[in-house]
């Protein structure tokens, strides 16, 4: 089977979750990963050596020999002047097939089409709306065409053009796999006459589930994710600010990196909470970090499927999250494994944090429930669900391997 990614070497959640799945499917299937654009020499996430990896276009600014590449490959303009990769991307003409996705260019259309036509797998899996369009239109006949999406229905259908692209892409597939049951229902209602089978499968946990729940005694509220606009860490900091004075023994640690870091630093300084609110940067030891905390907080304005909540559940942390579209409500059971707060209600978010801060018994009770709920997102469970999809398409694991 072949997975098609915008970037096989990307650092965001899409390559992370797709590579995680591919690394486990390779035990029973021949697996290939194709990245549209190659921007780094090494992948950000470990890829099993049994998986074949190839890239459609190499946009690294430097080649293996350290020499700058030409414009078609990235790094210099037509006059030989060095340009940033951002500027180089901005100079590209939009794709004729998927003009709404800035990662697709007119110059990348034909190479991607030719790459798809060369695929010899039984199944091709697109992982974005744009890639689903290409899979549905250009994957070889006789190949099962599967599409994923890692963002929610509400966001994808927010305007007419986005909605049209989603509908066209889905209808060219044999199977479309959104991340949540809510998305499944919405797409089925949007496309009642589509022959495409629409069935939801969530992402799997990135690491094993802990044997026992975290002790939740250290007075640390933790958050993690890319420091980008959609994650809305500014509203988490704002909601936490009153607790700096009322619960002085506690602190808020935020892990991650991104373009919003300067803005968040300014907000922390403006609110005067720098002694108790810290931007910790990226960590490669998140399971250990989470086990040393007491509460997990998520403030996103929108999600496809909130992997950070699964990771908190996997170590038995109680959670507090806004009920943003669309994933938190499918993971977080209000009053059972955490608190689900009406989207945008900062006062209620602050109150929920306070409630958990003041009761270690409640933290342990909700943390134990979170740990039990994590089993539904274990990798073996999610792989079994994917295998059922492939079996319906006539593709089965090889007995000799399994």
Tell what function each PLM region has:
Residues 282, 301:
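Aromatic "clamp/platform" in nucleotide-sugar-dependent glycosyltransferases that forms part
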Residues 318-322:
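Short hydrophobic beta-strand element within catalytic cores of glycosyltransferases
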């Amino acid at each position: 089977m072949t997975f098609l990614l915008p970037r096989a070497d990307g650092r965001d959640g899409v390559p992370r979750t797709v590579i995680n799945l591919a690394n486990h499917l390779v035990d029973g299937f021949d697996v290939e990963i194709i990245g549209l654009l190659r921007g780094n020499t090494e992948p950000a996430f470990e890829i099993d050596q049994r998986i074949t990896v190839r890239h459609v276009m190499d946009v690294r600014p430097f080649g293996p020999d350290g020499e700058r590449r030409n414009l078609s490959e990235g790094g210099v303009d037509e006059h030989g002047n060095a340009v940033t990769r951002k500027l180089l991307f901005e100079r590209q003409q939009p794709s004729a097939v998927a003009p709404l996705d800035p990662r697709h260019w007119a110059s990348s259309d034909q190479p991607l089409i030719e790459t798809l036509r060369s695929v010899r797998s039984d199944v091709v899996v697109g992982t974005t709306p744009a890639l689903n369009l290409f899979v549905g239109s250009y994957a070889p006949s006789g190949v099962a065409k599967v599409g994923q999406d890692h963002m929610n229905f509400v966001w994808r259908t927010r305007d007419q053009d986005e909605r049209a692209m989603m509908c066209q892409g889905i209808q060219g597939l044999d199977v479309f796999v959104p991340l949540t049951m809510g998305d499944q229902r919405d797409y089925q209602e949007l496309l009642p006459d589509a022959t495409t089978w629409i069935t939801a499968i969530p992402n799997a946990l990135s690491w094993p589930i802990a044997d026992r729940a975290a002790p939740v005694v250290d007075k640390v509220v933790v958050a993690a994710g890319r420091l980008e606009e959609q994650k809305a860490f500014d509203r988490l900091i704002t909601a936490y600010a009153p607790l700096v004075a009322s619960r002085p023994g506690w602190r808020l640690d935020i892990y991650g990196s991104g373009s919003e870091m300067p803005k968040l630093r300014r907000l922390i300084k403006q609110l005067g909470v720098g002694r108790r609110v810290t931007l910790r940067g990226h960590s490669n030891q998140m399971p250990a970090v989470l086990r040393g905390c007491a509460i997990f907080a998520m403030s996103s304005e929108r999600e496809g499927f909130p992997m950070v909540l699964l990771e908190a559940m996997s170590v038995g942390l109680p959670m507090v999250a806004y009920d943003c579209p669309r994933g938190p409500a499918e993971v977080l059971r209000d009053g059972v494994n955490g608190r689900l707060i009406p989207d945008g209600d900062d006062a209620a978010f602050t109150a929920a944090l306070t409630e958990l801060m003041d009761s270690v018994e409640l933290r342990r009770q909700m943390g134990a429930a979170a740990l039990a709920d994590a089993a539904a997102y274990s990798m073996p469970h999610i792989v079994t669900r994917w295998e059922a999809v492939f079996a319906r398409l006539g593709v089965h694991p090889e007995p000799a391997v399994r």
